[in-house]
A protein has these predicted regions:
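Histidine-acidic residue clusters that define the catalytic metal-binding segment
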Residues: 11-27, 107, 167-168
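Mature N-terminal segment immediately following signal peptide/propeptide cleavage
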Residues: 18-52
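Solvent-exposed coil/turn segments that connect beta secondary-structure elements
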Residues: 31, 41-43, 52-56, 79-80, ...
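M16/MPP (pitrilysin/insulinase) zinc-metallopeptidase core fold and M16-derived inactive scaffolds
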Residues: 48-112, 155
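Acidic/histidine-enriched alpha-helical segments
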Residues: 87-90, 133-151
Length: 168
């Protein structure tokens, strides 16, 4: 908790508020309403930062199919401070990805456990959630990627079944 507080607090009212702890998992709430679940596990040689936003494809309106998934892809395109997020994560040896589902979108990275890597991951996530660069040429190329992923899913009987089940 201390490294999180050190990274993201400019003054006392910005400090995460403790909500509760259940079976070693501490829940904190930031001033902006973001929920933080902190689960230290000193037996693991890695640190994982996973952000989940409760917005997904079911929140898309008519004519917006695929927009949540497209935005997920676009947030890997970089920021002014970090123009090559995937390259930076790869250089640090991270495993990373993002996923979109009906009711959520998440982004995660797993790195070697260190205060430096934890600080990097939290800082990088905060930066890309606010300062992502969304360029027309990137939108065009990622629309093709997302469309191809969607079409592959249309040919999967399991995916079609799941979509029909969850659409009710």
């Amino acid at each position: 908790v201390s490294i999180f507080a050190e990274i993201h607090t400019a003054n006392a009212e910005d400090e995460p508020a403790f909500v509760r702890a259940v079976e070693g998992i501490a829940e904190l709430k930031l001033a902006n309403g973001m929920q933080v679940l902190l689960f230290p596990d000193v037996s693991k040689p890695t640190v994982t930062v996973n952000l989940t936003f409760f917005v997904g494809s079911r929140h898309e309106g008519y004519g917006e199919a695929g927009m949540a998934h497209l935005l997920e892809h676009m947030l890997f395109k970089g920021t002014t401070a970090r123009p090559a997020i995937p390259a930076e994560l790869t250089k640090r040896g991270a495993q990373f990805n993002g996923t979109t589902w009906l009711d959520r979108t998440n982004y995660y990275e797993t790195l070697s456990a260190s205060d430096e890597n934890l600080e990097f991951a939290i800082s990088m996530e905060a930066d890309r959630m606010i300062n992502s660069l969304i360029k027309g040429e990137d939108l065009a190329s990622e629309m093709t990627v997302v469309r191809n992923e969607f079409e592959r899913g249309e040919n999967s009987p399991q995916r079609v079944l799941m979509q029909r089940i969850f659409s009710t």
